[in-house]
Amino acid sequence: ALPILPDGERAELIDGRMYMMAPPSRKHQRISTRLVSIIDRYIEEHKGKCEVYAAPFAVYLDERSNTYVEPDISVICDPDKLDDRGCKGAPDWIIEIVSPASKKMDYLLKLLKYRFAGVKEYWIVDPEKNRVIVYNFTGDESVNDYTLQDFVKVGIYEDFVIDFGSMEL
């Protein structure tokens, strides 16, 4: 478990090593808020069983609790993984919004941790590079590259497409 941190401080624990988290920028928060709203609306309209959570939301990727992360957005479809502390096990879909301080973590370390933990789909939204990278870890596994003006298909749903161009980012 994480040590007690001062108010306002956030950290993640990956393989027993603590990584401090920088506060998100206004643009980061705008992207996160819009995406959570779009995802939540889709789930409600389709009476889905999945739930969407924005950071700070605890995800314990392994039983040993030496990996604790706070993805920017987590979608969990198995209610048995949820308790008052957060999510135990891999969410179905994770979105990380890249900031200069989180670049290495999001593109390398978390990519591998999420894949091997059993996350089905992982999106990296990089406002600085104007791109959305979609990793689908199910079946044949694929990776697709989009811009922040594109329509992006959500892999865990049959008919869900997010129009980044209409989000006025």
Language-model regions, residue ranges each:
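Gly/Pro/Ser/Thr-rich low-complexity, intrinsically disordered segments predominantly at protein N-termini
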Residues: 1-169
